[in-house]
Every structure is written in structure tokens, then in C-alpha cells.
Amino acid sequence: KQASTLILKELKAFQAVLKTQALKHKMTPTIGRSHGIHAEPLTFGLKVANWYEEVGRNIERIKRARQVISYGQISGAVGTFACIHPEVEGYVCAKLGLKPAPVSTQIVQRDRHAEFFTALAILAGTIDKISTEIRHLQRTEVLEVEEFFSSGQKGSSAMPHKRNPVVSEQMSGLARVVRAN
């Protein structure tokens, strides 16, 4: 539950940045692509607005999943309350910010956690999609956008003139790790 609070905080900050960029570039023309091929013109702001909306859906998905996992149980080895009164379970769960699982065995059922991790995997897919698009748009032959590059930053150990999309590459890689687990 605490992890989801941190994730939501960062997602809301990310969404705010996307909103700022979408508004800033609402009139910045770029080429739309379909299957990687030039299609019709659009604005970079529209592209970013789509990311903004998708991140918003991820925020709502994580919120719903957080509610689904916010259950606990101490109803005994097989969930029969043989050694403890249900009121004790209610008290302990309330202290932990959880709700008592209506029915359980020795554990809270894992489908609750599976839903949360599925929401994380979908979020990771969004992050990978955005970072892959930025990497593509930073390619030399496209060069429509670039990641921030601070003064003194080296682009490549062997070719310092390069401006590699390091952050986007890291985001894609970490998103794959999330989806794989």
C-alpha cells in the first residue's frame, strides 16, 4: 500500500510534466506516423496529450488495484478463527490501514496481488512505449526531439560528440524488468 502511494505521487508529477509539455507544444507541427511511415501532420502537443491521457488511466488503474490489495487476515491456519476472535482481526487490520479479508485461508488470496502487479505491468508498458518513441524521435535521421543534455555530459565514451538517449534507454530496460517479473 505504501509503495502504491509513492508510485501514484511520481505518476501525478509525471502527468503534470506531460500536461505542461502538451500545452507548450500544442502548435508545434510534426509528422504523424502510422506503422512507422509518414502519415498526416499533427502537433507534438497532441502526441504528448495522448501520453498524458494514458498515464491518467494508469493512475486510476493503480488506485483501483491499491484498494484490491488493501486487505489483511489473521483468521488462523485455515481461516476459521479457531484461535482468535474476528474482532481482533478487524482491530489489527484497521491499525495497519487494511480491511479484513471477507473470506480467506491462511493467506490473503493471491489474485488480489496479481491484479496489482498486472496494473504495474500495464504502467511499465506505457513507460516503455513513451521512452521508445522518444528514442526513435532522437535518432539522427529523425531528430525531432532530444533528451535533456547537461553541459559537460558525455554522449559516449568512445564518441563524445554523440547525444545518446540514455534516460529513455534506462526507462525501457527497467520497464522490461517490471513486465518480466
Regions found by a protein language model. Name each.
Residues 1-27:
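Hydrophobic alpha-helical hairpins/lids featuring a short glycine-rich hinge
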